[in-house]
Amino acid sequence: MNKLNLINKFIFLFKHRGFILNVFFFLVVLTFLCPSFPLVFSNPVSQPLLIRFEDVTEKAGLRFRHNNGAFGMKYLPETMGSGLAFLDYNNDDWQDILLINGKNWPNRKKSQSSMALYRNNKDGTFKDVTKQVGLHSTIYGMGCAIGDYDNDGWVDIYITALGLDHLFRNNGSGRFIDITKESGLHNPDFGASAAWFDYDLDGDIDLIVTNYVQWTIKNDIHCSLDGINKSYCTPESYKGVSSRLFQNVGNGTFLDVTDESGLFDSTSKALGVAVLDSNA
């Protein structure tokens, strides 16, 4: 190609530069918009890891069976389950399991049931140590709260129950002692849930206990769906009962401060409780 031809081509491109730029711009835009021209700007996103859970109850050695005492009378508490907690009761840095249980109703001749404490064997299995630690008690339990109320470094257990709640102190030697009476924690109602928290910021934990309804065997109501056969009643059939707040005095005893704290509510029918600082 001679020099004259090169000059002519340059003159042609210069005269038509607007058209050429427009075509170039169109191709760039088309590249971004047209799905047939995919652009990869980063590495492909890897597939999320699929996590699955396996039922290892039997393999872990957990042989617990819940007993609600039902025998055909259709009492309201039979409709409830019961709570559990993970706790390190022996301070070995392994989580143990506490399972709350119900019991048979009075005058029923079946074998009685108890809550169960399973100690972590540190190999994926657990051992039932309920009797060994002093927790083999026939309580119609509902829930539990774990906390070190006496600040001795060992977690203690509070159990909400039908009829009377219980406080078990961890003595640090592998045993729990029922100190309900001497502690001043008297809740004879339909205890449902509980939570430890330091409401007065004095360095020791206090206790809030939620109660459900006013129910006993004596005041059980006959509810029916067909007008003949008894069915389980709903909570609307019963009166409410206030939850309670117990202040930790600091000497191993508690004081009921429900009224002065403003938490008294006789219409309450509480099953759960959550503690938080909502205006921090």
Where are these regions (language model features)?
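N-terminal secretory signal peptides that target proteins for export/translocation
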Residues: 1-17
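Acidic, glycine/proline-rich Ca2+-coordinating loop motifs
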Residues: 1, 33-280
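Low-complexity, intrinsically disordered regions enriched in charged/polar residues
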Residues: 4, 23-27, 47
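Bacterial N-terminal signal peptides
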Residues: 22-36
